[in-house]
């Protein structure tokens, strides 16, 4: 088993067998040749969907978080939007922190509310308030800890204990996997923006 520092440098990358570069190459190609119709080489077709550089990043983040897999998007807000769209549908309910990142808060209030998703805003530093906010149709509890920009700290493990049937999603942007491992504390999904500490 390797340590965090070694994983931070090497996790997720295997040198290709043709040239064996030590560092992860940056693939600048937007498209990849196919051997025939729908016969992708290495599973890559178009960089917007993925390429070997992005795959190495995804594998590294998954390894650092102790996750089975990771998916990289063009921005942290894109990752948040996708996570919520996968987990929520009209008629569902989300519990969100009263000091969540403004972009996340606006996405929930302005987009998901119009989509028919209800929300309850609570103080995530109070697990009892979180427990009281969970409803029969609650599908997501959104935790950001430390929060951006107020640096509020939520007890992920205590919230996991009261989440009931809801998915616990943790925005781990400020702490990074070096300081906090949400999956080990009961999170179901972890998101990051790589504009901070990753």
Tell what function each PLM region has.
Residues 1-43:
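N-terminal glycine-rich, Lys/His-bearing helix-loop that initiates the first secondary-structure elements
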Residues 4-8, 59-63, 186-188, 192:
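Short, hydrophobic/aliphatic alpha-helical segments
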Residues 10, 69-198:
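Conserved PLP-enzyme active-site core in the AAT-like
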Residues 31-81, 103-110:
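Conserved N-terminal alpha-helix of the aminotransferase class I/II PLP-enzyme fold
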């Amino acid at each position: 088993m390797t340590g965090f520092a070694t994983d931070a440098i090497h996790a997720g990358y295997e040198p290709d067998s043709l040239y064996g570069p030590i560092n992860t190459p940056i693939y600048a190609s937007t498209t990849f040749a196919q051997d025939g119709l729908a016969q992708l080489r290495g599973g890559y077709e178009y960089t917007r969907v993925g390429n070997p550089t992005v795959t190495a990043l995804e594998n590294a983040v998954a390894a650092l978080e102790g996750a089975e897999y990771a998916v990289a998007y063009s921005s942290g807000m894109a990752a948040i939007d996708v996570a919520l769209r996968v987990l929520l549908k009209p008629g569902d309910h989300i519990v969100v922190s009263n000091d969540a990142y403004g972009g996340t808060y606006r996405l929930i209030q302005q987009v998901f509310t119009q989509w028919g998703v209800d929300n309850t805003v609570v103080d995530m530093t109070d697990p009892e308030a979180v427990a009281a906010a969970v409803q029969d149709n609650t599908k997501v509890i959104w935790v950001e800890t430390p929060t951006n920009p107020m640096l509020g700290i939520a007890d992920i493990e205590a919230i996991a204990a009261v989440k009931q049937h809801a998915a616990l999603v943790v925005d781990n942007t400020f702490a990074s996997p070096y300081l906090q491992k949400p999956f080990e504390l009961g999170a179901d999904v972890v998101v990051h923006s790589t504009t901070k500490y990753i």
